[in-house]
């Protein structure tokens, strides 16, 4: 049930209102942090004298933090209000960046990464909650997630440039921490009316204690969740290990490798901005679009595997990002059509929670494979993940056809 908004809240739905611009900035900062982290992995490995398998622990602890916030966000928002919740997230984000910047022992680096994961989980969840309550929420949420891609596009360029200038890998985290400060100030000043607990949604759920149980009984929800599990594994594994792959396996220089990774995130961003609209004009259903995107990912990965040229790698990773871009938001958008209306919100929450496991598990496995067999394994590994994801998406579509004769669009 949507909250009835005041005139002031309706005005905040404007694309250029300060609070929406702050939300875009927050998501861009999350993307900037994620995009930069992959470029910094070799520097962390050298500085702390740890291998790729140990570095994979960074993904596990970060995702643990995100996962904890995904399951406790309702209670925290109810207790703190949305403003307090977002302020908490910005502070945790800042603490995590400061921890990395100080170059502490590796055990404390893991704690800093946990703080970053908690902070990212709060900022993403809180801003999604706010924007989803506004008019034009569908369009605004699409733009919101696209700005993550904008940040992820800039992140590798910033990080690789700083490394190229020999400013030290920790300088990247001081920059990120500095950017957290205006976000924190914005949450304090612009969310003053969001100190109350969120209405209706939690109260409704209290009266329907079996909502999550009912959600878990629906097979198509599990299939969609498993699709997103593997999708996130593909996206994050490539986003974080492509730079190391280009350095170690293709012997590219650091600056070019950073630009190629940025091209991957640029493709992801552009895919979210344009692919769905283009498909709609061409009367291609969202289901068919995802099939086509998955095939494009496999073709691009094979192309990079077989042709060892920098230009092919650059174009291939950009195409992969472009093809991956719309899959996550389209799956979330289709979910209410797959389940009864009463449990749609619960189903979406379950999908997001399961996808976080993919964010932790698959990049870690990529690191283990890179350490044991070499970074060349990244491409066949992601091809295998994409094939499995294709199978789960086929199952989602055909389970839906069994449930209803209506077409998924």
Show which residues each predicted segment covers.
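C-terminal transmembrane helical hairpin of 12-TM major facilitator-type secondary transporters
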Residues: 285-331
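Helix-loop-helix hairpin linking two adjacent transmembrane segments in secondary transporters
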Residues: 137, 143-195
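A late C-terminal transmembrane helix in Major Facilitator Superfamily
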Residues: 338-377, 381-382
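Extracytoplasmic gate region of multi-pass secondary transporters
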Residues: 37-38, 219-262, 269-270
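Conserved MFS/SLC helix-loop-helix module at the cytosolic interface between two early adjacent transmembrane helices
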Residues: 68-107
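Cytoplasmic helix-loop-helix junction between adjacent transmembrane helices
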Residues: 112-149
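Helix-breaking motifs and short loop linkers at transmembrane-helix boundaries and internal kinks
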Residues: 49, 81, 102-107, 251, ...
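Helix-to-loop junctions at the C-terminal end of transmembrane segments
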Residues: 69-81, 272-285, 370
């Amino acid at each position: 049930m949507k909250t009835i908004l005041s005139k002031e809240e309706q005005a905040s739905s404007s694309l250029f209102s300060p609070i929406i611009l702050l939300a875009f900035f927050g998501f861009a900062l999350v993307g900037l942090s994620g995009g930069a982290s992959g470029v910094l992995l070799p520097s962390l490995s050298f500085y702390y004298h740890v291998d790729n398998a140990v570095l994979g622990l960074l993904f596990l602890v970060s995702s643990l933090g995100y996962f904890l916030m995904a399951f406790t966000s309702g209670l925290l928002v109810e207790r703190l209000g949305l403003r307090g919740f977002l302020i908490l997230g910005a502070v945790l984000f800042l603490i995590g960046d400061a921890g990395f910047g100080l170059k502490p022992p590796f055990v404390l680096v893991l704690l800093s990464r946990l703080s970053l994961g908690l902070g990212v989980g709060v900022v993403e969840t809180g801003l999604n909650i706010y924007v989803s309550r506004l008019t034009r929420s569908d369009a605004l949420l699409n733009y919101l997630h696209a700005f993550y891609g904008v940040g992820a596009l800039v992140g590798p360029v910033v990080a690789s440039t700083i490394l190229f200038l020999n400013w030290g890998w920790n300088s990247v985290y001081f920059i990120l921490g500095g950017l957290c400060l205006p976000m924190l100030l914005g949450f304090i000043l612009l969310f003053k009316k969001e100190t109350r607990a969120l209405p209706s949604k939690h109260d409704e759920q209290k009266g329907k204690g079996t909502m999550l149980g009912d959600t878990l009984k629906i097979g198509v929800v599990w299939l969609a969740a498993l699709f997103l599990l593997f999708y996130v594994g593909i996206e994050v594994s490539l986003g974080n290990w492509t730079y190391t792959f280009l350095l170690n396996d293709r012997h590219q220089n650091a600056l070019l490798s950073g630009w190629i990774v940025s091209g991957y995130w640029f493709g992801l961003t552009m895919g979210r901005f344009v692919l769905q609209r283009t498909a709609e004009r061409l009367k291609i259903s969202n289901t068919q679009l995802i099939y086509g995107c998955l095939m494009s990912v496999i073709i691009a990965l094979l192309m990079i595997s077989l042709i060892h040229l920098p230009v092919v790698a650059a174009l291939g990773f950009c195409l992969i990002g472009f093809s991956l871009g719309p899959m996550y938001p389209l799956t979330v958008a289709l979910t209410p059509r797959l389940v009864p209306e009463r449990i749609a919100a619960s189903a979406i929450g379950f999908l997001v929670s399961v996808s976080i496991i993919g964010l932790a598990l698959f990049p870690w496995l990529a690191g283990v494979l890179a350490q044991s067999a070499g970074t060349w394994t990244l491409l066949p590994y992601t091809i295998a993940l994409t094939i499995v994801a294709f199978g789960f998406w086929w199952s989602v579509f055909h389970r839906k056809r069994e449930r209803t004769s209506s077409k998924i669009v």
